[in-house]
Amino acid sequence: MPNRLSAPARARSTPAARPARPGTGPLPILASALLWGTTGTASSLAPGGAPATSIGAAALVLGGLLLFLTDRTAWSLPRVCGVRERWLLVVGAVAVVGYPLTFYPAVPRTGVAVSTVIALGSAPVFTGLLGWLTRQGRPGGRWAGATALAVLGCGVLVLGPELAGGGRAVDLLGVLLAALSGLSYAVYSLIAGRLIAAGRPSAGVMGAMFGGAAVLVLPVLALGPVGWLLSPRGAGVVLHLGVVTTFLAYRLFGHGLRHTSAQTATTLTLAEPAVAAVLGVAALDERLPAASWCGLAVLAAGLAVLTLPRRR
């Protein structure tokens, strides 16, 4: 990713500017998507009285603090970076908070399937547009084609069961909230990629942003019911979401951003609903219609276009 910050000359040769190698860029991004794909299965095991926003807030507090406390560069990053970069960290933290606070309220209005498609499908588009507007690089034809395939496959995969059953009425507020969650994801992915391209350590960037987000989201957790956290099931769900789908996944995601542009990364994470669908079939005894399996194949083709090396 081209660096547009007031960065030293070493940023011109940042790894993000070189072609992504599968082992250092796409594979960590895909691994993070695999971990995120367990979110739905894990959250479905939460106690019945646990609000979705509280589950998301608790996971963000735990995972965000782990990302911040386990990397010393995250502690010092706000002090050593410039004023402009500090503001980027603040905006990134707000965007991190914005994702669960818009996505989870969208789910009861539009359903899990529609919310997932809108949020994940819009994120690569927002990332490409924002990256172009902020002069972080114009998306190429390969990215556009792969993203179109991946978004189409994601939509058919996730919406297949609802299309087969007649679907439900569209809730415009739910659609808007889901789109805002996609925008939030795009914003903090771009900011993280920009800071990493400027030479900042990936673990420090993710730790600083998510640590700030953990502090910002604390009131949401404190003002909601917390009794469910004391049950073994509730604690287990939050441990999985906080440690696996937040701490480990975003540590991998940040490492991948060092070698992969944010535009490509947000497209690759469309693998998340594929993982969720397979887990639903394997662990929850769910059934997918033929259309969903076709969508899974199209999605895999789009991801392969981005992941496989170019022909020389």
Where in the sequence are the language-model features?
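Membrane-interface interhelical linkers
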Residues: 1-34, 63-91, 104, 138-145, ...
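Hydrophobic/aromatic residues within transmembrane alpha-helices
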Residues: 46, 55, 106, 133-135, ...
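Membrane-helix interface residues
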Residues: 49-51, 110-111, 137-139, 199-200, ...
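Transmembrane alpha-helices of multi-pass small-molecule transport proteins
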Residues: 2-10, 47-98, 124-130, 183-191, ...
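Specific alpha-helical transmembrane segments that line the substrate/conduction pathway
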Residues: 54-65, 104-138, 181, 263-281
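Hydrophobic transmembrane alpha-helices of multi-pass small-molecule transport proteins
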Residues: 67, 139-161, 210, 270, ...
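Hydrophobic residues within alpha-helical transmembrane segments
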Residues: 27, 31, 58-62, 94, ...
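Hydrophobic alpha-helical transmembrane segments of multi-pass membrane transport proteins
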Residues: 31-38, 42, 70, 90-109, ...
